[in-house]
C-alpha cells in the first residue's frame, strides 16, 4: 500500500514536472513567436502612428494649393508700383469629359428611340474641348488630346495665369456646351507694374517661384503671404473626387511695402538722366540719386540703361542694342582668329583638331550670349553695385575731417605751383601753372590737388584712414536692397604716403554711388551718418503697421558746427568756382565737382560727377549725378563730338543744379535771391544814341538789361542812364525816341513796405536804378523795404543808382 502510494506520488510529481516544462516551453515559444508581433504592433500603433496617419491621409486625400495674393508695393505718395491681379489656371478633368460623352450618348440613344431630334447630342465632347482650348491657349492639339485620353484623371493643368480676354472665351465655351465639370478655372495671381520702368532696379520682379530681384526678392517673406489649400477626397485608384469631399483653407495675403521714393522726383531724375546720357553719348549710362538729408530716405534712384518690369527679359535701350550687335560681331571675329591660330599650331606640331575645336562661333550664338549679358546689365542696380573713383567729390570729406580735427581753418593758406612731389611721384594740379597763394575756400573752390594733399598730410595716415571708416567708405551702407556692393580701398598695411596723397583727391580707390552720397550727406546734414533706405514702412492687408523705418543716425562723424562751416565753403564752390554751372538764381546750392579717369588709362574715358545739396544754409535734399564714360572725340580728347567739355563741372553740375531747383520748387521751398540774383551785377550802360530801336535792343539785351521806349521817333535821341554809368543787370533802361527829353531830376518815391520786385519796377519807371541791401544777403517774397538811401519826395538825379534796404517781414 505504501509502496503503491509512493509510486503514485512519484508519478504525479513526474507529470507535474512534465506539465511545468510543457507550460514553460509553450510560454517560451509564445514569447518567441508573438513578441515580434507585439513589437511590430507597437511600432505601427505608437512609434509610427503619425507617419502612417499622414500617409493614409495622403492616399485618401489630395491637397491643391491656393495662391495667396501677393502684397502691393506703393511709392511715397501712395501710388501703386507693383500689384497682383487675379488671373486663372486652366484645368481639365479627362474623367469628367468621358462621363459627359457617356451622358450625351445616352441622351442621343433615348431621343432616337422616341423619334426625337438627336442633333443637340450629336457632337463629341473631346473634339470640342481640344479644338477650342488649343486655339484659345495656343496649345498643340495632339498633346491636348493625349491628356484627354487619361480618363482616370480628374486634374490636368493646361495653362497658368491666363488674363481676362482668354478667361472670358473659356467661360463662354463652358456655358455654351455645359462643360463646367470638364473645365475648371482655378484662381491664381499675376504681378503687374503700372509704371513699367519707373524705379525698375529698386522694385525688381517676380517669377513662378516668387520674388526674383530687387525688393520683390529682398522682402519675399513679407510680400508672398501664405498659400491656402483645397483638400479633396481620392478613390482607391488615386483619382480625385472633386464633388465627393472638399475642405477649403483660406490663403493669407502678403503684406504691403510703402517706399520712400517720391514719384515726381523720380520722374524728374529719370527723364533728366536719359536726356543728358543721350546728349553726352555715355558708353555705360549714368546714375542720379536723391536723398533726404536729415533722414537718409532715398527720394529717387535713377539709372540708364533701364527696362520694363512687365517685360523684363527684353532689351529696348538703343545704346545696349547697338553694343549687342558690336559685341556679337567681335565675338565671331575672335572665334575665327582662335581657330586659325589653333590650326596653325597643330600643323606645326603635326597634330589635328577635333571637330569641336574647329567649330567657329556663329553670329546667332554670339548674339544670344551678348543679349543675355545685356539683360543682366540692365537689371543691375548701378547705384549700389557699380564702383568708380569719386574724384574731387571726395574732397568734401577731406575738408570736413581737416576742420573737425583742427588741422586747418578758414584762415589757412596754401601755395600751389602746379604740382607737388610726394615721395618719388610728381602729382600735378588741374591748373598746370598753379593757383598760387590761396585760402581754404579758394583751394576747395579751385579743387586744388596740392592743397588737399597738404590737408591729408596734416591729418596723417592713421587719422585719415579712420575718417574713411567713420564716413562709411570701408563698409556697405546697409541700404535695404539686395546685392549691395562695397568699394575697393587699400588695407591699412598698404596705405602709405602716396596712397594718402591720391586718396585726398579721390583717386586710386573706388566707391559705389550710394556710399559716396551717404558720406557726403554726413558732411552737410550736421555730421550724422544715416543708413540709406527705400522702404519706409510695411503694412498688413488690413492696413495695420508691421514695420516702420527708424530715422536714428548710425553715428555722428563731425560736429554740427564743422558741418555748417563745410556748407558755407561748398556753397562758395557753386557761387564762385568750379561748380558755378550748378548755380540757379533764387536757390542756395552747395556742392563739389568730380572728374576721374577710368581704369583704362589714356583712353579718353572718364567718370564725371557732381554732388549737390540745397538749401545750403539748411540742407533738405542732396543729389549725386554721375555720367559713366561720355564719348570723346578720340582717346586723347576731353571734348565730346558735339563740343561739350568732359568734366564734372561742365556736364554733371548743370544737371544737378537744374534738378535741385525743380525739387525745391516741388517741395515748397521759397526762393531766396541774392542781390546779384535780384538786380544783377553792375554793368556799364552802352551808348545807343542815333541807333534804331532794333539796333539798340540787341546791344542792351547783350548787357543783360531791359528797356522801354518814350516817344515815336525812328532813332534814339536820348537814354537813361547816360553812357558808361553802371547800373544793375536786369534793370529797365529808358530810350527816348523823338523830341521828348527827360528832366534831370525826379522825386524819389516812397518804397516803404514794397517787395524787391515792386521797388525795382517803381524806380525803373522813373529812370532810377536800385541796388538792393539786406542783413542776410538774401531776399524772398517776404522781404520788404525798410530803408532807402534817398528819402521819399527827395529830388534825385534820373539815371543814378540808389541803395534800398530790405528786411524779412516774416520774422524768420
Across the structure, where does each feature detected by a protein language model lie?
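Periplasmic/cell-envelope proteins involved in peptidoglycan metabolism and beta-lactam response
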Residues: 1-361, 378, 387, 462-474, ...
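Beta-lactam-recognizing serine transpeptidase/beta-lactamase-like catalytic domain environment
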Residues: 5, 82, 88, 235-248, ...
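Short, solvent-exposed beta-strand edge segments and adjacent coil->beta transition regions
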Residues: 87, 153-155, 252-256, 381-385, ...
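Sec-exported extracytoplasmic/periplasmic mature domains
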Residues: 134-138, 175, 207, 224, ...
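Acidic/histidine-enriched alpha-helical segments
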Residues: 143-151, 190, 282-295, 415-419, ...
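Short secondary-structure junction motifs
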Residues: 180, 283-286, 409-411, 476, ...
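Short flexible coil/turn linkers enriched for glycine and charged/polar residues
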Residues: 196, 617-619, 729
